[in-house]
Amino acid sequence: SPRAYIIHAKANQELLSGFEKTDSVNFLKKYNKLLKDRENRPFLDVLHHNLALYYDKNKKIGSAKKEYNKSLKAKTGDIYTIASNYRNLADIYFNENKYQMAGKYFDSTLVQLKPRTREFRFIKKKRENLDDVIKYEGIANRNDSIISVYGMSNFDRIAYFEKYILQLKKE
């Protein structure tokens, strides 16, 4: 439909010009107007995705996460946009050192992509490398908790284990 061409043209116009050169006030005003227009409802995923890219490039990570999730909730069926949202969220969590969460988002990305594509192989390799990081991070966290218990005084250690036993009994 012609509306689809208009939306994609407006969305990609900012991508091509580069978000760094964009006047943020005018950009946000324009995008909010596009988001509020009822005729654009079938394209909310693309609009939220591009708004998330804008926030991501401008280091507003919290806003970027919200917009990526809004794009995912729009559910319009554009597989590549869905995969791109998951991949970008995975990269955000990876950069925040939240490797387990990043792994989950990479898994969701792989589900959306065709297995014979270059992007699929790249993300699959990245995900496999992340498995070792997640494994060693779990070991380090467990060892840190053991060391912290060992560093407690006898009184604190007894109180800690009594509290833990009560917690297990409740379950």
Question: Positions of the model-derived regions?
Answer:
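Acidic, polar-rich low-complexity tracts and alpha-helical solenoid repeat scaffolds
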Residues: 1-171
